[in-house]
């Protein structure tokens, strides 16, 4: 259990360091990217740096399974340059088609592309019982994180090709941090038990790795 505690601390530290490695977006920037959840915002900010203001549809502390966007958020979405989705989370299953219909000009990018997906479990939302065929918690894995940041990089280059070298440099830095974190976790787990219990099944990808 002690090994698992330190390992989870390493994961949290990785996400925190990723979010802190890029300048916080300032209010009033003209270029906005909307993402679904906070972990994806952290990754996107790490690659986008000061070129885009990144905002989350699901606020910190809210459930991505049950959250409904506010009218103000729906209006603000129309001002975004793009929408980055995490892929298979409850909010997106409920809302993504409606968001696309309401903003036909807005490009949507799926950051789960090329991620080796795992079978999920049944989650209950406020509207339906969604039997998730896919576990949506893809960000809780350093191996997946490498794929996610590459997807973000490619999307940003499509949106803003003039700054491709800038994004490539930041991608290299973030990838190095991810790999360093992976090495630290492997060291911590070398002699640890390989079985653990968790209340919410959010670490399936981590357990696989």
Regions found by a protein language model. Give the residues of each.
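Extracytoplasmic metal-acquisition and chelation regions
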Residues: 20-209
């Amino acid at each position: 259990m002690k090994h698992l505690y330190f390992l989870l601390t390493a994961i949290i530290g990785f996400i925190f360091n990723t979010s802190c490695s890029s300048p916080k977006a300032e209010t009033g920037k003209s270029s906005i990217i909307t993402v679904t959840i906070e972990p994806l915002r952290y990754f996107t900010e790490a690659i986008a740096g000061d070129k885009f203001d990144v905002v989350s549809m699901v606020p910190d502390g809210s459930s991505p399974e049950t959250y409904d966007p506010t009218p103000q958020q729906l209006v603000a979405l129309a001002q975004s340059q793009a929408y980055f989705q995490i892929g298979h989370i409850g909010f997106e299953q409920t809302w993504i088609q409606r968001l696309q219909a309401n903003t036909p000009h807005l490009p949507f990018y799926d950051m789960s592309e090329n991620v080796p997906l795992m079978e999920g479990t049944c989650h209950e939302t406020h509207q339906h019982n969604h039997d998730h065929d896919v576990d949506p918690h893809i960000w809780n894995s350093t191996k997946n994180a490498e794929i996610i940041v590459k997807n973000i990089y490619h999307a940003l280059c499509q949106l803003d090709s003039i700054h491709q070298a800038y994004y490539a440099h930041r991608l290299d830095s973030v990838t190095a941090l991810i790999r360093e974190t992976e090495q630290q976790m492997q060291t911590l787990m070398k002699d640890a038990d390989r079985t653990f219990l968790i209340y919410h099944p959010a670490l399936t990808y981590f357990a696989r790795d």
